[in-house]
Amino acid sequence: MKFNLWRQYGALNSSPVFDAFHAGANALGHDVVVNGDNGIDVIWSVLWNGRMSPNRIIWEKNVSQSKPTIVLEVGGIKRGTTWKVGLNGINRTAYFGEQDNDRTRADSLGLVCKPWRSNGDFILICGQHDKSLQWQDMPSMSNWFMQTYREIRKHTDRPIVFRPHPRCRLPHIELGLKHVYRQEP
């Protein structure tokens, strides 16, 4: 199999992840090229903004040709240590392989799922970048945040902590809102 890495359209923190993918594919006997014109394209994220915006052209070409795309992204479990790789997307729309995995990997990372809780010191709202494919068909992030805030306030006065996406910060959106505090990512 042949993989085309589109490194120049990756985020500034993407180099080690591209390097690891490249080394892993080579170790498994696959060919890897940079900016190739055949094989399976490997892009960074589905955020069509800044350095990563040219990935959209690659993505849309592959979708129109029913060609797979591998998407790399920083990890959500241990940021800077773990990373994600998905086929034809990342997060909700991607294929990540087998679904019936045992706990071996989670245990090696020291991960324990905590039960859902309906109480606590605050409610956490995590933002997304509204130029991301992951946010497709959603309102603007600022509109979504305000709708979510109003809905929460119908049910509770507990403090709300807003953690914005690092590249879609919505500066000062919390100002003037009752018990809303910002937590920078």
Task: Outline where the language-model segments fall.
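Nucleotide-activated sugar donor-binding and catalytic core shared by glycosyltransferases
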Residues: A25, N35-N38, L111-N143, L170-V180
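N-terminal pre-catalytic "stem/leader" segment of glycosyltransferase-like enzymes
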Residues: M1-N49, S132
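Short, solvent-exposed loop/turn segments at secondary-structure junctions
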Residues: G10-A11, V46-N49, G75-K78, Q128-S132, ...
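Active-site regions of enzymes building and remodeling cell-envelope glycoconjugates
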Residues: N26, D31, G39-I43, N55-W59, ...
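A short, gly/pro- and small-residue-rich
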Residues: N49-I77, N143-Q147
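A nucleotide-sugar donor-handling region in carbohydrate enzymes
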Residues: K67-M138
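Well-ordered, non-membrane alpha-helical segments in soluble/globular domains
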Residues: S14-F21, S53-I58, P139-E151
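Catalytic donor nucleotide-activated moiety binding site of glycosyltransferases and closely related
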Residues: R7-G10, M146-E184
